[in-house]
Amino acid sequence: MQRSTRLYLVPTPIGNLEDITLRALIVLKEVDTILAEDTRTSSKLIKHHKINNKLESFHAFNEHKRLDSLIQRLKQGEIMALISDAGTPAISDPGFLLVRACHEQSIPVECLPGATALIPALVNSGLPSDRFVFEGFLPPKKGRKSRLEKIKEESRTVILYESPHRLLKTLKQLGELLGNDRQVSISRELTKLHEETINGSFEELLDYYQNNTLKGELVIVIAGK
């Protein structure tokens, strides 16, 4: 690891605590400060791998407020790592603003390769993976309809993140818009004990999830038009 000012973006496991690279562990042990989306969640990983560095919160509700002070600390020589609760930071998680500010101030940014939920879900879906588009989380209300309309016309495989309490609503809306026979794959609890991937049509998956209890974050992979 380079001992010069920079921001490291460090992917963390999406479930199994062993799914972290040796390089990521070295970086987390050697930086001055670790910025975490939720320090309570990240402390489990930190303790598991015997990392003793300072942990500070950096999340959607304080990133604007903390941005200037973090940039000043980086400019003064501090070395930081940004992690999310699970997976690669700044993908459907806080981090974009800090990365952009670092580039604007000529502060080096280095992103390590590592875990992210969308790629295992895509590969495991059996749907075309040579061309795909990642939409993240759909808006819960405002802008949801227009986003769904864009997905309707998409010829590439589409990947979405969704929470359990909104899944049935999302499947119903997508089925009505794209056709209930459109093929879809849903992965949940990736890398965990109860990992599950279900493939079928929107109609089949809606029926399945109406009769099965849901837990854990979900990845929806939809066949293109």
Which residues are covered by each model-predicted region?
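Glycine-rich, flexible N-terminal cofactor/catalytic loop recognition
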Residues: 1-60
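Generic beta-sheet signal
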Residues: 6-10, 76-84, 132, 156-160, ...
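Short active-site oxyanion
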Residues: 28-34, 106-109, 157-158
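Conserved helicase motor
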Residues: 57-64, 137-139
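Glycine/small-residue-rich loop that forms an oxyanion/phosphate-binding "nest" at active or ligand-binding sites
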Residues: 59, 67-116
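A contiguous loop/helix-start segment that scaffolds small-molecule binding in enzyme catalytic cores
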Residues: 78-79, 157, 161-225
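Class I SAM-dependent methyltransferase SAM-binding "motif I" and its flanking Rossmann-like core
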Residues: 97-154
